[in-house]
């Protein structure tokens, strides 16, 4: 070992100790998660829930838009119909082991039945436990939109006006006129 190698090795050791000394009293980056709550941004997308309307009925009308827009295909449902003609999902299933929490299902839902919550603690030991059924997804309240009721807003006639005559409403399209 030459004198030059000895000096370089010693300088390297001194520099390492100096760097440790500089960083020893800085604020730690590690979060003590279970003891301290984690800061989540206001628009954080976490666990998906199904909500109810203000009347207590489930909002989902089984339109299948959420399953169609899901890029990984983790949502599956089957439509059924009540005696009064209202649609509802006979089963609604989300496989959270495949879900990427993109939020497209929430945007596609016309009834605001699907909502993403800031809940992120979904760790399980078995993958089968990450498949949530309708009973596990449905919450008792309306979620982010407490006053919205799909069946009170859609399909309600406006007194004195026929279809296409209301403000900000387009004229109905005659689909048969578009055919070749």
Curated annotation (Swiss-Prot):
Pfam families: Fer4_7 (PF12838). It catalyses: a quinone + NADH + 5 H(+)(in) = a quinol + NAD(+) + 4 H(+)(out). GO terms for biological process: aerobic respiration. One of its GO terms (molecular function) is quinone binding. [4Fe-4S] cluster 1 binds at residues 60, 63, 66, 109. One of its GO terms (cellular component) is plasma membrane. InterPro entries: 4Fe4S_Fe-S-bd, 4Fe4S_Fe_S_CS, NADH_quinone_OxRdtase_chainI. It is found in: Cell inner membrane. Residues 160-174 have a biased composition (Basic and acidic residues). It is a peripheral membrane protein. Residues 50-80, 90-119 form the 4Fe-4S ferredoxin-type domain. Binds 2 [4Fe-4S] clusters per subunit. Its main location: membrane. Its cofactor is [4Fe-4S] cluster. Its EC number is 7.1.1.-. It comes from the Bacteria. Belongs to the complex I 23 kDa subunit family. NDH-1 is composed of 13 different subunits. Subunits NuoA, H, J, K, L, M, N constitute the membrane sector of the complex. NDH-1 shuttles electrons from NADH, via FMN and iron-sulfur (Fe-S) centers, to quinones in the respiratory chain. The immediate electron acceptor for the enzyme in this species is believed to be ubiquinone. Couples the redox reaction to proton translocation (for every two electrons transferred, four hydrogen ions are translocated across the cytoplasmic membrane), and thus conserves the redox energy in a proton gradient. This is NADH-quinone oxidoreductase subunit I. It comes from Photorhabdus laumondii subsp. laumondii (strain DSM 15139 / CIP 105565 / TT01) (Photorhabdus luminescens subsp. laumondii). The gene is nuoI.
